[in-house]
UniProtKB/Swiss-Prot annotation:
Disulfide bonds: none annotated. This is Glutamate racemase. GO terms for molecular function: glutamate racemase activity. Belongs to the aspartate/glutamate racemases family. The active site is at C69, C181. The lineage of its organism: Bacteria, Pseudomonadati, Pseudomonadota, Gammaproteobacteria, Enterobacterales. Keywords: Cell shape, Cell wall biogenesis/degradation, Isomerase, Peptidoglycan synthesis. Pfam families: Asp_Glu_race (PF01177). It catalyses: L-glutamate = D-glutamate. PANTHER family: GLUTAMATE RACEMASE.
Amino acid sequence: MLIFDSGVGGLSILKNIKKILPNIHYIYMLDNESFPYGNKTEFFIIQRSIKIIHTIKKIYPINVVVIACNTISTVALSILRKKFDIPIFGIFPHIKAAEKITKNKIIGLIATKATINSSYTQKIIYEYSCSNTIKIIGTNKLAVIAEKKIRGVAVSQKKLKNIFRPWINLPTCPDTIILGCTHFSLLEKEIKNILYKTRSVYFIDSIKKVIFQIESYLKTSNVNQKIKKNIFLYSKNNNNLKKLLSFLKQYKFTVIKHINLN
């Protein structure tokens, strides 16, 4: 199984997969050379995704791909499924779930600008805004803050307030917030403290949905695992990567190595 993202947000998906399928072997591709995907063009996102799958598929016998990134999923998943003959799973902003939960009919959606601007997201926003007010924050800064938090950098309250200022000033805030990026679940506590010190809020990420899809597929398809190691690949060697190595120990990767995607 190949799981890939431009950062470590996708490790939250891997963590959940390990809980339900502890014997699965996996490759995690950290495309940190392209971090964050959210500020890239659709053309770049599509071509980069094709390059990642094609390159790794030539080296390792992968039989399932998990795109652990809302941006790539909303922009490129349909193209990737046509391009490759293996099952590819993606993760999407789960507005349908938010509609079932919201009580004040005000739903918040936080995602990267590329995710917000994708035709997929625009379509579902239009579909569900008929019966709900959907407040949107498109930002590429939040994923960067989450990555820094994992490396031990304190989260800046000032930066968070600047990002969420459009909601802070609302007379009524969303009571349900969709986390449209796998990084954002790392900042739930900080976001709640900024917006809802005395009120409750329900956060929705789409991890549970994609995990259910992956679990259902793997349990019914008898996938033959030819990879017998857990491998961590990265596209750029830098100081940020070195700071992540201690964090990665919990995932028990047996191989950590660079891969050239250029």
